[in-house]
Regions:
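Mature, function-bearing regions of proteins
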Residues: 1-135, 142-276
Length: 276
């Protein structure tokens, strides 16, 4: 009963049952094969939540990326909807049937083609800009991978880390990215090169607070949500925390990591009893 309850709570979080959404079924005919590193990294609920929040906060330090999200999404009113959309896209392109994944990619490309605008300072942005696509992809990949390494596979080899970047680069290229980094070192070099483009302003601070101070969907979920947020801030690089004006979690870092590891192991146990 406990196992079923935990599984249903997670499925409700990531699938809009009112809209008829069901969990993505794993297929042997996916874009990425079952023995890929990405299948390991993207299959853990806790680390994907932690990595996803950390990635989002880092990604939005780029003013052009933030502009597109701020002006064209319901970031303030529907954060759960945005979380579901991102999680389902990753699940479909990792585990779903090949045709299903390709259709999801085409839908995103269509949406991106209409996301254009101008920042308050006059700079133009567009969501299908290959440079911005690479930034979002690389920041996300680094943090998903690092969350998995911290709480799931701390002894992962550098060869497997490089394999992961090479595997997921194909998704970024299908979305319109060019010269997408295909190794850990290439990804880190890309981030270092982009750092000069990052900045914070009132929008960034508002976005940070919308993410980190969002109320839990249910009171019973508030402690876990607070833990995920603390673990995400802890996972971020020091320079990104500093730009956001964030400090290490109020709880000691070892306590946050231990509690997050416990949560991850509990959910792995819950999902080990049947299909995800």
């Amino acid at each position: 009963m406990i196992r079923r309850y935990l599984v249903e709570r997670v499925r409700d979080r990531f699938n809009d049952r009112a809209a008829g959404q069901q969990p993505i079924q794993r297929s042997d005919n996916a874009l990425l094969p079952p023995d890929s590193v990405a299948w390991r990294v993207h299959g853990d609920v806790t680390t994907m939540m932690v990595g996803g929040i950390a990635a989002l906060l880092v990604e939005m330090l780029h003013p052009l990326a933030l502009g597109g999200v701020w002006d064209h999404s319901k970031v303030a009113s529907d954060q759960l909807g945005r979380l579901r959309m991102t999680a389902r896209f990753i699940a479909i392109t990792t585990y779903g049937e090949r045709d299903q994944a390709k259709a999801a990619i085409e839908r995103v490309r269509m949406v991106h083609s209409h996301v254009v605008g101008t920042l308050p300072d006059g700079r133009a942005y567009r969501a299908d800009d290959p440079h911005l696509l690479n930034w979002i992809h690389v920041a996300g990949s680094i943090h998903f991978l690092d969350a998995w390494r911290r709480f799931g596979e701390p002894q992962m080899t550098m060869a497997d880390q490089d394999r992961y970047f090479a595997e997921v680069a194909g998704i970024a290229e299908a979305l319109g990215g060019t010269e997408v980094p295909k190794s850990r070192s290439a990804a880190e070099e890309f981030v270092a090169a982009v750092r000069s483009e990052l900045q914070t302003d009132d929008r960034t601070r508002q976005f940070r607070d919308l993410v980190l101070k969002a109320p839990a969907a249910r009171k019973s979920e508030a402690p876990v949500q607070a833990l995920v947020m603390a673990a995400a801030v802890d996972l971020m690089p020091a320079w990104a925390r500093a730009m956001h004006g964030l400090r290490r979690p109020p709880l000691s870092t070892p306590a946050v990591r231990l509690a997050t590891l416990g949560t991850a192991r509990t959910l792995r146990w819950a999902f080990s009893g049947g299909p995800r």
